[in-house]
Amino acid sequence: KRIAIIIPYFGQWPPWMELYLYSCSRNPTIDILFFTDCPSPGDTEHVKFHSTTFDEYCKRAASLLNVRFAPHRPYKLCDLRPFYGYLHRQELAGYDFWGFGDIDLVYGDLSGFVNDCALDRYDILSTHADRISGHFCLLRNNEANRNIGFRIKGWESLLENEANVGMDERPLSQVIVPE
């Protein structure tokens, strides 16, 4: 199964970036697709860097989602996570799963958790049993999951709100497992 994790990241790489990239290299079944203005440390077989600015990325999201999305801080991009499948559908062509994650994780051997048995059985994998976790989540690359963000109640106003509202966690969890 082909898996891609989308990570927009702007500013400066954190001091632990080399360690993060090393941990990615130890999980060859997962591709990491960065959208960034940071200097590329160089593509590896499973980590790709797409050069863009924060403003360009926000304008692309605003245009595709038809909302006013012009945050002042990159952390607000976490609220776009439920829409990554839709926003990056071209880059995700050919992948079986897409997902999102944080770069302050050091991945161990994910094959115990992300394996053919789990990928065949589930449409969504996350690190918590009762909710979606923003630090690591995979969704089957199908039309329903590419459009899952549009099912979040009031998604337009949540995206247009300057503050980060955690759309990748509670609001997305409420769509998947209604309370």
Descriptions of predicted regions:
Residues 1-19:
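N-proximal low-complexity "stem/linker" segments adjacent to membrane-targeting elements
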Residues 7-9, 34-36, 101:
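Short beta-strand/turn micro-motifs composed of small residues
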Residues 19-31:
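Short, acidic, metal-binding catalytic loop of nucleotide-sugar glycosyltransferases
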Residues 37-93:
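Active-site-proximal specificity loops/subdomain of glycosyltransferases
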Residues 80-124:
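GT-A fold catalytic core of metal-dependent nucleotide-sugar glycosyltransferases
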Residues 120-136:
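A short, conserved acidic/glycine-rich loop-to-beta-strand motif
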Residues 135-143:
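Short glycine- and hydrophobic/aromatic-rich loop-to-beta-strand nucleating segment
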Residues 145-179:
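Catalytic core and acceptor-binding pocket of nucleotide-sugar-dependent glycosyltransferases
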